[in-house]
Every structure is written in structure tokens, then in C-alpha cells.
Swiss-Prot record:
Family from the record: Belongs to the polysaccharide deacetylase family. ArnD deformylase subfamily.
Function: Catalyzes the deformylation of 4-deoxy-4-formamido-L-arabinose-phosphoundecaprenol to 4-amino-4-deoxy-L-arabinose-phosphoundecaprenol. The modified arabinose is attached to lipid A and is required for resistance to polymyxin and cationic antimicrobial peptides.
Enzyme category, top tier: hydrolase
Assigned keywords, A-Z: Antibiotic resistance, Hydrolase, Lipid A biosynthesis, Lipid biosynthesis, Lipid metabolism, Lipopolysaccharide biosynthesis
Record organism: Salmonella choleraesuis (strain SC-B67)
GO terms of molecular function: hydrolase activity, acting on carbon-nitrogen (but not peptide) bonds, in linear amides
Name this polypeptide is given: Probable 4-deoxy-4-formamido-L-arabinose-phosphoundecaprenol deformylase ArnD
Catalysed reactions, as listed in the record: 4-deoxy-4-formamido-alpha-L-arabinopyranosyl di-trans,octa-cis-undecaprenyl phosphate + H2O = 4-amino-4-deoxy-alpha-L-arabinopyranosyl di-trans,octa-cis-undecaprenyl phosphate + formate
């Protein structure tokens, strides 16, 4: 049996309103639990449109047929009008999710984090994280114990900024296996659970066709030599590709794969995890930098 952590990112108002309820129903039908990470502030995702001038981002949008995949309400959100507050508008849905699944913070403002966190000061990072955690805790009525940086935009500064929030774990980077981030010699931070597998929008296109994606990703899960963690998005697998995701759950079960919340991947003694650090890097299919796992020594 292969255990795969299932992470569900919720980036937008529509993803929360439409995608999450469908995913909750789908997961319930198949007896699967996952980790949901919510954006709870303004939905300004449409402001990413200016990135179309960047060839890699434009190619990604064309390759994934973004208008069909996400819908124009997502692609234009927060452009000609102020972005609506996701958490306030969907508190009931978020509370229901937290009743049945591990629930953590993705971002206060997903667009702002993805665009500006790379040059924010530690103080600004802490303020933004605190704003998101406070809002999410007010909605779900219990402490937030985990987080996942929007767009995997994280580095050593983000790791340090999150230390004051006493989280059980963070999932801020791409990598191969769980690790303890080294803050300074002799001092480690909150365990990191990296995403190890590609997302739909990173690979779909000439190399991998939509109809063969499930077969392809299951093969990658079975071949993963680390701690497999897979990310889906409420805006994709919860809406236009919900049937594809349901088919994935069936095929994965038949292949001996069990999905679980990320928290279940943590060992009883996190001190046994290897040391590592998060550095800025790049991966195929994703425009811009993102946090990547790198080995570190204790010295």
C-alpha cells in the first residue's frame, strides 16, 4: 500500500463557493480525507493577468487552456473592481470543511503573497500571516495548526516568519521528503512537508494529454521514492475537472494508493526528520521562482 498526502489548495472565491462543496462530496463518497488550505482575504487573482507579458506564464495559460479551466470570473477577479472577501462570503463552507478535514492557511491575499512576499520584510510577512490565521481561526472556531505558502513562494525568511505561530507543520515548498528546516546551527524550525508531485497545470499539454493524465500521475505516485504529496486545486479538480479527479480516486485505490491528510505523514518524533532548508528555485511548467527543498548539515 502506497500512502500519498493529498493537499487541496483553495485560491479564489469561486473555488471556495463551488469547488470545495463538490470536493467534499467527492471525498465523502470515496472515504478519503485530505488537507485543505484556504485563502481567506480578498480575491485579487485576476491581477495576475499582467504576467501574460512573460513568455513562460503566457505559454502555461495557453497550454492549460486557462479560460476554460478557471473561468473568466477567476481570471478577472480584483481587476476592474475590489476583490471580494473570500472568508466572509464562504464561512459556512470553510467551517464544514474543518469539521471533516485538516484545515490550514494558504494565504490572506493569494495574489499579494505570490507577487510581493519575495521582497517583504520579516515584519510584513508576520503581519500578513497573522491576518490570515486570525481570520481563519475566527471562521473555524479553533486554532490553525498548519499552513501552505501560496504558489510555493517561500524561502528562509518565510520559514523564520512562521516560527512564532506554533504551527504543527508547514507545506511551503517542493521537494522529496519531510524535513526540519535549519534556522541556524543547532536550531531547527517547524517540520516541512514538501509537495513532491507535479500539478495538473504544470504538465498538461503536448507531453501529457488530459485523457492520459490520471494514468501518468498514478505512475509517478507509485514511483515516488520519498514521501509522496500531491496537490490539487479547488478551482480545477473541484469544478471543470471534478469527474477526472473522481476517476483518479477510483484508479488510485485500485492501484493500492491510499490518500491521507498531510498531518498523518508526520512521524511520532519529528526530531527524527532529516535537516534541510528552503531555497529559491524553478521547476518545469511553473513560471517564476518557488521554494525548493535543499539538504543541510547540522554544522
Amino acid at each position: 500500500m502506497t500512502k500519498v498526502g493529498l493537499r487541496i489548495d483553495v485560491d479564489t472565491l469561486r473555488g471556495t463557493r463551488e469547488g470545495v462543496p463538490r470536493l467534499l462530496a467527492t471525498l465523502h463518497r470515496h472515504g478519503v480525507q485530505a488537507s485543505f488550505f484556504f485563502s481567506v482575504g480578498p480575491d485579487n487573482m485576476g491581477r495576475h493577468l499582467w504576467r501574460l507579458i512573460r513568455p513562460r506564464f503566457l505559454w502555461k495559460m495557453l497550454r492549460s487552456n486557462a479560460a476554460s479551466l478557471y473561468g473568466w470570473d477567476i481570471l478577472l477577479a480584483g481587476t476592474a473592481w475590489p476583490g471580494k472577501n473570500i472568508g466572509n462570503a464562504n464561512a459556512g463552507i470553510i467551517r464544514e470543511t474543518a469539521t471533516y478535514h485538516e484545515t490550514g492557511l494558504h494565504a490572506w491575499d493569494h495574489h499579494a503573497w505570490q507577487t510581493h512576499s519575495g521582497h517583504w520584510s520579516i515584519r510584513q510577512l508576520k503581519e500578513d500571516i497573522a491576518r490570515g490565521i486570525t481570520a481563519l481561526e475566527a471562521i473555524i472556531g479553533k486554532p490553525v495548526t498548519c499552513s501552505a505558502a501560496a504558489g510555493w513562494r517561500a524561502d528562509g525568511r518565510v520559514v523564520r516568519a512562521k516560527e512564532s505561530f506554533n504551527l504543527r507543520y508547514n507545506s511551503d515548498c517542493r521537494g522529496t521528503t519531510l524535513f526540519r528546516p535549519l534556522l541556524m546551527p543547532g536550531q531547527t524550525g517547524t517540520p516541512q512537508i514538501p509537495v513532491t508531485l507535479p500539478t495538473w497545470d504544470e504538465v498538461i499539454g503536448p507531453a501529457v494529454q488530459a485523457q492520459s493524465f490520471n494514468t501518468w500521475i498514478i505512475s509517478r505516485m507509485l514511483q515516488d521514492k520519498g514521501t509522496p504529496v500531491y496537490t490539487i486545486h479547488a478551482e480545477v479538480e473541484g469544478i471543470v475537472h471534478q469527474p477526472l479527479f473522481e476517476d483518479l480516486l477510483v484508479r488510485a485505490r485500485d492501484a493500492g494508493i491510499t490518500f491521507c491528510p498531510l498531518g498523518e505523514l508526520l512521524p511520532a518524533s519529528p526530531e527524527s526528520l532529516p535537516l534541510g532548508q528552503i531555497v529559491r528555485g524553478h521547476i518545469p511548467g511553473r513560471e517564476g521562482w518557488l521554494g525548493c527543498q535543499q539538504a543541510a548539515s547540522a554544522s
